Amino acid sequence: MTTTPPNAATPGTDDNQLIAERREKLAALRAQAQATGRAAFPNDFKPGDHAVDLHRLHEGKSAEELEALAIPARIAGRMMLKRVMGKACFATLQDGSGRIQLYITSDAVGPEALAAFKHWDLGDILGAEGTLFKTRTGELSLKVGTIRLLTKSLRPLPDKFHGMADQELKYRQREVDLIMDEASRERFRARSKAVSSIRQFMVEHGFLEVETPMLHPIPGGANAKPFVTHHNALDQQMFLRIAPELYLKRLVVGGFERVFEINRNFRNEGVSVRHNPEFTMMEFYAAYWTHHDLMDFTEQILRHAARKAVGTAQLAYGGQAVDLESPFARLSVRDSLIAHAGLSAAEAADTTVLRAKLEAHGEKAPAHWSLAELQFGLFEAAVEEKLWQPTFIVDYPVEVSPLARASDADPTITERFELFITGREFGNGFSELNDPEDQAARFAAQASNKDAGDEEAMYFDTDYIRALEHGLPPTGGCGIGIDRLMMLLTDSPNIRDVILFPALRREG
């Protein structure tokens, strides 16, 4: 009995040699197909069953019941394992739902078909039809009556015992990662469930899903460095969007009182375990909501997504518990310094102390920074990474919140929040600034910063100011990082683990 075909990929084997051998087999298949009038890559096989359903429906039946019922099944998938034993062979077929074992004998399929099967390779895609039975070890299997090669695989799969050890290779050849690793497939299924559940949740709460431009004449909606391109027909510079915010708020001006969009944003910045230049965000806006309403709703969204994707809102990330079930904590920037940075109330209000604390963390605060900016700077340096359980941080300074409404009680801070979990930002929202003159002044300040060399500062968006002049109702808006949420829900340490095809340096 052989369990590994002569041309299966094993450590130390030359892949080029294996590919050459498989190409020879394909050439023979083409010649045979031409001689018989058949297709080398046929597309007329229609599977009627899936592995997971066959197991679910028939796993509990005894061998005797299966023999008496003679249940037919027709399945297609990729051959992952193969055992050749003279006039009989076993193979494991993997389809989109799972795996099932095939039993192929000369008596059932004929000597010619069995001989052909023995030359097929791991990774080939097969179609098989037969009846279900159980082996002597009790494994549900398909006793094959007919079997066909549907797609010849030219590249060998990684060795089943070693898999894809190179993590970057998994990102670069995601299709192979998905073939070999059930955990990877489950991770992306969970992502799909979560995104679908969020979309359904938004619609059920009266939000209209919309699509706004990906190419912007002016980048806006966030402080970030954009990707730049050129529109040939219009002969003008364009930017891949860094955020959809300004377009979505223009829709609220137009009368769509609740809107949301789940789509890609692009930021020409660094790559890390938490950052990918192309990433998925959901932004939503609701007329007559405040930042308090947004926080309540954001909690509900995350809780709902967790339950739908993984069955619970009590999670574990990196071996530590994360509780999305309980109410999320809420702290001002100032109070977070008292709770997590060891400052007293007096110290948190003392600019000299704050500057000294920042220097102790290796940060030199600019001379013009206000009290609120110093508090925020120290928050980023000393507090952010300590916020493991879900925590909303509120009362951000105006200087770092150019689109947020200022607080009526203290105009130096805004009605803005950010949500932190596991020491990372997951969401950002605020009561929207709907005073067109105030917004124009803030855009002007941002434009001055850009002229002074700040590449991430915002442009002055005349179209948006004109829209505001028609009147934006009191509105709340929030953005949630879908990729980081998926990292949390699937306990993934790297953002590239939850993006099917992450950004990588070009090979060669």
From Swiss-Prot:
PANTHER family named in the record: LYSINE--TRNA LIGASE, CHLOROPLASTIC_MITOCHONDRIAL, LYSYL-TRNA SYNTHETASE
Keyword flag Transport: no
UniProt-annotated binding residues for Mg(2+) 2: 425
EC number annotated for this UniProt entry: 6.1.1.6
Entry-linked Pfam families: tRNA-synt_2, tRNA_anti-codon
Primary localisation category: cytoplasm
Subunit structure: Homodimer.
Record keywords, A-Z: Aminoacyl-tRNA synthetase, ATP-binding, Cytoplasm, Ligase, Magnesium, Metal-binding, Nucleotide-binding, Protein biosynthesis
Enzyme class label: ligase
A molecular function GO annotation: lysine-tRNA ligase activity
Single GO cellular component term: cytosol
InterPro entries: Aa-tRNA-synt_II, aa-tRNA-synth_II, aa-tRNA-synth_II/BPL/LPL, Lys-tRNA-ligase_II, Lys-tRNA-ligase_II_N, Lys-tRNA-synth_II_C, NA-bd_OB-fold, NA-bd_OB_tRNA
Family the UniProt entry places it in: Belongs to the class-II aminoacyl-tRNA synthetase family.
Binding positions for Mg(2+) 1 per the UniProt entry: 418, 425
GO annotation terms (biological process): lysyl-tRNA aminoacylation
Record carries keyword Cell membrane: no
Required co-factors: Mg(2+)
Organism for this UniProt entry: Methylibium petroleiphilum (strain ATCC BAA-1232 / LMG 22953 / PM1)
Catalytic activity: tRNA(Lys) + L-lysine + ATP = L-lysyl-tRNA(Lys) + AMP + diphosphate
PROSITE patterns linked to this entry: AA_TRNA_LIGASE_II
Compartment(s) where it occurs, according to its Swiss-Prot or TrEMBL record: Cytoplasm
Name of the molecule in the record: Lysine--tRNA ligase
Cofactor detail note: Binds 3 Mg(2+) ions per subunit.
